[in-house]
Amino acid sequence: MKIYISGKISGTNLTETRKCFAAVAKAMKRIGVEPVNPLENGLTEHDTWEAHIAKDIADLLQCKAIYMLQGWQESKGARIEHYIATEIGMPIMYEIEQPIISENE
């Protein structure tokens, strides 16, 4: 099952954000889930925000669920992804309620 990882990216320290998203993706793989990481969508930081959100939405629509990282509400893109998931009836999981990474990782 594919699950889309959604969270704040714009305006963050990209090195730290990449580590966070990668850790979540690794944990998902460990439990048999296929993660879809928007930081690995083939676009670069030089592409426009509009190009990123268009690709992210296309990728989201190929998934069975969305996993919202803490702080997602602070991200325009993550709020759009959440809205779409809500409107199409996609299951939504929240890191705050269903952490996928243990404190030891």
Predicted segments with their positions:
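Conserved catalytic or regulatory cores that recognize and/or transform ribose-phosphate-containing ligands
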Residues: 1-105
